[in-house]
């Protein structure tokens, strides 16, 4: 007999981004904590959550906004995921 898949609660984060990457990051971290407190087991952010959406055209001047993976943002999320158990 087939086993039913386990139910998983998702937290899907979407927010407007302003010009301050650190303020955007703080918003996402707070929303991540709130989603975990509401029972989310897997939490997904929107793409480019630290910056305003700039992908309307290819602009090499803003390529410096990218980060390596692993890098500073993923390290913070790894620690937060461990702390929250998500």
Report residues per predicted region:
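Basic/polar N-terminal segments that are highly enriched at the extreme N-terminus
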Residues: 1-7
